């Protein structure tokens, strides 16, 4: 099961740049749910952690924490959602893949809502692919 979850993390990373839109407005939290008070704090902490692999893909900073089955995506300065951090944790239960997502977006509400919608769609496509194949 651990190997499949790691494969899912790699798979999520491969889809990070083919985002699409959905209609539902995202729910908002009153405080950060990513474990850090700010996007900058999260990025600095993850970059300092030797167990986490950090790479830049198409301007996005991607931090992969295989031990905790977590993939972080940080928007580039060129993106309307900058600065933002998307934290996704992959779980497998009863042969079903689940993605738990938390977002901290410090940009405008419309840009943040759009970012969340894009990642929700991405997560849905990834889950469908992992359940049913390409």
Identify the residue ranges that each predicted region occupies.
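Bacterial N-terminal signal peptides
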Residues: 9-16
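A mature extracytoplasmic/lumenal domain signature
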Residues: 66, 75-78, 90-91, 101-107, ...
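N-terminal secretory signal peptides
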Residues: 22-81
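Short, surface-exposed coil-to-beta transition loops
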Residues: 81-87, 98-100, 113
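C-terminal partner/receptor-binding element of secreted or periplasmic proteins
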Residues: 104-134
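A short, surface-exposed beta-strand/turn
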Residues: 86-96, 122-123
């Amino acid at each position: 099961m651990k190997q499949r979850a790691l494969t899912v993390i790699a798979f999520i990373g491969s889809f990070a740049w083919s985002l699409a839109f959905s209609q539902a407005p995202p729910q908002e939290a009153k405080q950060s749910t990513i474990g850090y008070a700010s996007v900058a704090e999260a990025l600095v902490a993850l970059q300092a952690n030797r167990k986490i692999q950090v790479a830049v893909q198409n301007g996005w900073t991607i931090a992969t924490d295989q031990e905790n089955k977590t993939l972080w995506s940080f928007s580039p300065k060129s993106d309307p959602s900058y600065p933002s951090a998307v934290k996704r944790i992959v779980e497998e239960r009863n042969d079903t893949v689940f993605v738990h997502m938390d977002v901290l977006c410090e940009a405008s509400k419309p840009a943040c809502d759009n970012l969340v919608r894009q990642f929700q769609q991405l997560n849905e496509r990834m889950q469908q692919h992992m359940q049913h194949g390409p």
